[in-house]
Amino acid sequence: MAIDSTTAQSYKQLKEDFVSNLSGGSVSEIAQVCAVAPVVSLVWSVLQARQSFFRPYTPLGYAIDFLLNVGALLLSVTLYSSAPLLLNLLLLTVAAFVYLVPAHTRKKKPQLPPNAQSKKSSSEQPLGVLSTKPFLTNYRGNMLIVTCICILAVDFRLFPRRFAKVETWGTSLMDMGVGSFVFSAGVVASRPVLKERAEGKAAPLSTRLKTSLRHSLPLLVLGFIRLLSVKGLDYAEHVTEYGVHWNFFFTLGFLPPFVALFQSALKVLPSYAGLALLLGVVYQVLLETTSLKAYILTGPRNDLLSMNREGVFSFFGYLAIFLAGQDTGMLVLPRSLSRSISGSNNKTSGTVQRRSLLLNMAGWSLVWIALYFFATDYKYGFGLSVSRRMANLPYMLWVAASNAVLLLAFYLVDALLFPSFYSAQDVKTEKELYDMATSKVLRAYNRNGLAIFLLANLFTGLVNMTVPTLDVGRVATVGILVAYMGALTAVAVGLDEYNVTIKL
């Protein structure tokens, strides 16, 4: 039902008020909701590892894949939003039941004669320096799905207001979501840096800037398209989120050139985490010791900078989050251990590799948690409050700590149920094990993540222009969200099925 033009202006104000002046929820509750994703990954992995449920990939397999990796996450922010622990318990019960069911025995491949085996092994491509690990696909795919769900769900009354973006001070699920989007982009961005190091090359600053601008341009164009669309259609806006003209695509678009500049600083401080902390601390000091905080929160909007001050200055916090993500990527993407050719050492090599990665990830998780504690605790720390609006130091540390713990949880599922992936000796075997250990739905979201996110924004706008979301009941809300995510997932899986990659 279209909204009558005579009430459009007052309805627009209602929608703006609906997402304004919110104070968020507790960090512990947000952690419980976020925990649904790795628990879902556990259920999926037990089904696959014990029962080979998704091999071959049938329509039933797709339905269960969708229900787990999309449906459960949708439930966590709607019908089960007040009981995330119960949802986690129910999912863990399913995982335990499936695990206890006798394992499905797969038919073994016929043994090849010795001469055929030697020919086969000689033609196999050896492993490279980097690896596409299943837990990274699961982590990033789940993050993209939750983000897509929330950007539409927030406009309905069924979505709890404590999960929507906070006005100034506090924490919320959507505040974590936007930070996680940037953090995960940083993880992925470490891949070309690692390739350069492996090849012993170091691209000059001018080359890095040219490459970064090529990545930035499409995002900046999308930012301008969104700006013109919002203004032209008189769409409801939340000005204190980014400013009058700024939007998230501009933040994403300006990240690559600044990251390229910061890469030069590695000669002085050879750590992305160190650079992230340095930037975050300097920015926080400026907020606390100058009039910058007051300017961002209460200054008049009388020129282009002041109109977009939230977007401009929060960019430095998001840059710090991106660098923290890049540091994590430098840890989890490479193959840090050399592999032995002999079969007797394969298991040892894989075991040592898993243990080493586990200890490093756990260590960094503790570091980020400790830093967040000292930044925010009133008794033992600095007593600072989280602000996504300014993307201050506590916000950056909260995002880094939460994502580090989430990655660790996804990795534990990976290492426990698909350990053979870490013992693969050639590209073909590793690819087969990777496909076995990852959901087709999550792989599809990963492949065209930014394009699907853009499509989700378009669908969100379409729904808001045609449906009075504030007047929709619980059942209808769930129906709309399921249809919306069903369409998005169908597009993502369809693109993947036809081997289409959209680079933005």
UniProtKB/Swiss-Prot annotation:
Main location: endoplasmic reticulum
Protein name listed in UniProt: GPI-anchored wall transfer protein 1
Listed pathway(s): Glycolipid biosynthesis; glycosylphosphatidylinositol-anchor biosynthesis
Protein family: Belongs to the PIGW family.
Top-level division of the source organism's lineage: Eukaryota
Gene Ontology CC: endoplasmic reticulum membrane
E.C. numbers: 2.3.-.-
Biological role: Probable acetyltransferase, which acetylates the inositol ring of phosphatidylinositol during biosynthesis of GPI-anchor.
Transmembrane stretches, start-end: 27-47, 60-80, 83-103, 134-154, 169-189, 211-228, 242-262, 268-288, 312-332, 356-376, 393-413, 450-470, 475-495
Residues listed as glycosylation sites in the UniProt record: 21, 346, 499
Topology of this chain in the membrane: Multi-pass membrane protein
One GO BP annotation of this record: GPI anchor biosynthetic process
Organism: Neurospora crassa (strain ATCC 24698 / 74-OR23-1A / CBS 708.71 / DSM 1257 / FGSC 987)
Keywords associated with the record: Acyltransferase, Endoplasmic reticulum, Glycoprotein, GPI-anchor biosynthesis, Membrane, Transferase, Transmembrane, Transmembrane helix
Entry's localization field: Endoplasmic reticulum membrane
Pfam family membership, one: GWT1
GO terms assigned for molecular function: glucosaminyl-phosphatidylinositol O-acyltransferase activity
Name of encoding gene: gwt1
